[in-house]
Swiss-Prot record:
Assembly information from the UniProt record: Homooligomer. Interacts with the M membrane protein in the budding compartment of the host cell, which is located between endoplasmic reticulum and the Golgi complex. The cytoplasmic tails of both proteins are important for this function. Interacts with Nucleoprotein.
Effect of residue 101 to V: In strain: Isolate Vero cell-adapted p65
Family: Belongs to the gammacoronaviruses E protein family.
UniProt organism field: Avian infectious bronchitis virus (strain Beaudette)
Protein name as it appears in the record: Envelope small membrane protein
Lineage: Viruses, Riboviria, Orthornavirae, Pisuviricota, Pisoniviricetes
Length: 108
């Protein structure tokens, strides 16, 4: 209240009231500017998400499904992956066992 009393003594009640009103008006305008900025940022994010992120993800899924995904469903490739995978797990300290499906042999 010391600042208010000093302003009242030096400037009078009219100018002090005017300064207070101008201060509140400045705070109001600052709030409106921030609100407009947040609204613009929200619209920008929504635009990029709608027109870039979602179509990009769907396009990537589509390309994967009809290119690499189709190749991965090849039974010959699956047989190679399954049969050449070590039969004793990931972190086993024993030497890996590999199975040769074409010759029905087990290698270690």
């Amino acid at each position: 209240m010391n600042l208010l009393n000093k302003s009242l003594e030096e400037n009078g009640s009219f100018l002090t009231a005017l300064y207070i009103i101008v201060g509140f008006l400045a705070l109001y305008l600052l709030g409106r500017a921030l609100q407009a900025f947040v609204q613009a940022a929200d619209a920008c994010c929504l635009f990029w998400y709608t027109w870039v992120v979602i179509p990009g993800a769907k396009g990537t899924a589509f390309v994967y499904k009809y290119t690499y995904g189709r190749k991965l469903n090849n039974p010959e490739l699956e047989a190679v992956i399954v049969n050449e995978f070590p039969k004793n797990g990931w972190n086993n300290k024993n030497p890996a066992n590999f199975q040769d499906a074409q010759r029905d042999k087990l290698y270690s």
